[in-house]
Amino acid sequence: MATTKNFKIPREKLKTFVRGKGFCIAPDTVLVDGIPVSLIYRVMPSSLYDSGWRFFTGTESDEYLANARYNGVYDLNTVVNYCPEAIHLLDSPPYTAFRRDEYGEWINISYDVDWRYWF
């Protein structure tokens, strides 16, 4: 029996920030628990509809992320509702990564990432 997730932002409250940008991956820590996004990165899209974007809070363990029950594929606009301050980053190319600093500003960490880890 499938379970229904109780998203922090109900569907009817979602705003339209972006259209037609594809889908992304995000865990329940963002969409259900409402913990602020602190790490985003973009990989090469795996399909026509994949934006390549991945969003995380930074609190997720490897075990948590390995459990498909706690992760989902969502329209990019849905996830951007949880961190609209990242909209200006969405046109960044694949193999780009950002994390928030102690002031909440996005810092480009693309050169600090071992991209082999993600594949």
Model-derived features with residue positions:
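Acidic, aromatic-enriched beta-alpha/helix-loop junctions
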Residues: 40-90
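Short acidic, Pro/Gly- and aromatic-enriched capping/linker segments at domain boundaries
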Residues: 10-28
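Short, compact, well-ordered microdomains
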Residues: 73-118
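Short, basic/low-complexity N-terminal boundary segments at the transition from targeting/disordered tails
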Residues: 2-14, 76-81
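Short low-complexity stretches enriched in small and charged residues
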Residues: 6-15, 54, 62-65
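Amphipathic, interaction-prone secondary-structure segments
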Residues: 23-49
